[in-house]
Amino acid sequence: MARSLPYSKKIRQVEALLPEAMHAEKHAVMSELKRLKRKTNSGAPDGSNGPDASEKAVRSELDRLEKRLRRSMAQKQRRRKNRPAVDYPENLPITGRSGDIIEAIQNHQVVIVSGETGSGKTTQLPKFCLAAGRGVDGVIGCTQPRRIAAVTVANRIAEEMGEAPGGAVGYRIRFQDRFSKADGFIKIMTDGILLAEAQGDRYLNTYDTLIVDEAHERSLNIDFILGILRKLVKTRKDLKLIITSATIDTEKFSKAFDEAPVIEVSGRMYPVDVEYMEDADEGAEETLTYVEKAVEAVDEVIRRKTPGDILVFMPTEQDIRETCDTLEGRGYRRTRVLPLYARLPAAEQMQVFKTMPERKIVVATNVAETSITVPGIRYVVDTGLARISQYDPRSRTTSLPLSPISRSSADQRKGRCGRVSGGVCIRLYSEYDYASRPLFTPPEIQRSNLSEVILRMLALNLGEIQSFPFIDPPPAKQIKDGFDMLHELGAIQAAAQKKDGRGRIKPGAPSRKGPRLTRRGRLMADIPLDPRLSRMLIEAAARDCLAEVTVVASGLSVIDPRERPEEEQQQAEAAHAQFTDPASDFISWINIWRACFGAPAMSRAFVRAKDLKAFCRKNYFSFKRMREWQDVHEQITLILNDSGLGGETPADTAPEPLPEGEMDFSAGYAAIHYAV
């Protein structure tokens, strides 16, 4: 019988297999080998006096690790053999730079690719990574800011490679995983998925290459990912990182990643004519809403009798529904009107990508601005608006106002047409207005309540905000204010401090660890809203008055809609008085809501635009602000329902229905005010 190898020789034998194993297995086995080495060095037998129970356990463990590595080696060999062949569409501008980009990926750890709209960067870069030899030691991961983009990009790459989605190319989004761990090479995912994976594996060992697409959007998720990767590339020298965007601040990103090389790719653009709408005369009353202006613009395009599909950008889902209803009522011949927004069911989203005999009019939010390409678009109608979160440090509130988009976003929208032929972009604002807008939308971290950022970082275990390597670090005072607010709301507990032998806190002693989330704080972190609002809504849910407090919370997020024209102040005050509760402004908000939109409920409050206008004229309210209140209420309701907080009250505890037009606050009055 052959004599067993000593520990040291057996360990060296296992270590010799490491280079040919997949990276994730290599990392896991190395950790276990370190543990075994510590065990053997601490006095475990070496086999010279015959194996005992401890020695057998160690040898068994080494045999197990060897088998694990050999399985991983076989998998790596299969991946090397089965790596898909790739080619690139000749009509894409990025194809002309394929050699330069592949060489940069091979020779540099981090590469920045700045590609204009239509360059093909989103679909071709993962294939360039395969051509550069990546995807064997681990997966090529690519993040997208939206679920619809992740799905459509994965499907497009799979189609170009002659693969079925879920094989060599797959995707993972919330509640849906179509990626094969055994056979997958390219994985497209939302940035939120990668963040979640980083909590379970801080070294992201599954991946040998990561592509962060649309980095110019600078959402909190993207900034969190870039911060994680700034640290990770220093410890994982084998990891390749590509940062890509249509409109990126290349100098800032290159500097953040140690002067990483930048490759610029031009876009494929047929000529696009831009038509502007002149501003109304100063002092003149605006008679048309942006929805009505957009519909008139579509009417004009239809009258031109030139072919091509139409893409209309709207800021909110409510606007999309109203626009679609109005356009369908026009009765255009051989035309199909299709909505597109993030929460639309996937089957309905996919309709916009299909080739149809009818002319398509797609009405979309800014999900259609980047990453996804709706085929056949020749006309773009741009309202120039989006709902952009904004924190006001003076009032300490976060709102979701309708805001003018940046020039960069406007150019992205323009780039959606002119992909297959000359296009026309109709902007429902003036050229002067466009020129006066900022070049980029400020990063979300600069528009956010820092308490919300801190809350999310604690929930994601990202470490202390003061030392996190943000691309644009927040000011120290704002960080302090953020912590102060979270303490006030009961969302975090102060760090425990070191104590002496008698249990007394040592003067000036550092804390054992940073602040931690309370149970309430963890609930708040699950609701992506201003922490003061999420705290209010959690309390309301516990006190069975969530629908009413959602009305109040959304009302507090917009400008007071009540109007008092100088020449009609008495009439306005009389109209407002019918909704006023003498003891509570909050109940007054609920009274207004009930009169206009019906009883508060955790569902969409729908009222036709013409009916809302009539209500506003009669009662001296701003149509624009009432509409904004309605939109914010819908956003909060959707967030609460997604988080599980907005579920219906069980039937056996539901209150008696109230007579129409009446509201008995004897039971709920105190609960509402305690929550608020």
Describe the function of each predicted region.
Residues 1-536, 655-657, 661-665, 674:
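P-loop NTPase motor module signature
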Residues 114-116, 485, 522-528, 533-676:
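Extended, charged helical/alpha-beta scaffold domains that provide interaction surfaces
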